[in-house]
Amino acid sequence: MGPYELLQRIVETLDRLGISYLVTGSVAAMAYGEPRLTNDIDIVAAVEERHIGGLLAAFPLDEFYLSEEIIREAIRRRLQFNIIHPSSGLKVEIIVR
């Protein structure tokens, strides 16, 4: 899985769950034609407790690292959590707003 495939999967999931979001960082810069090397994707998103089940279902533990406990803490404290695709080394940082 490459960064664009992972980004597509993330945004399709966020759209399906009704989570508003903003792609930022190097991936956003590349979309505007600024070449960058990156192994992570940064997204600011309005994730709420009601979205946790959908996120866990969309990114199964046999393919991704995603911690329910860390998501809950990130929502409670307005922090960030990661969705990691170990076989590709790609990481998505979700910054909770």
Tell what function each PLM region has.
Residues 1-97:
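Compositionally biased terminal segments of proteins
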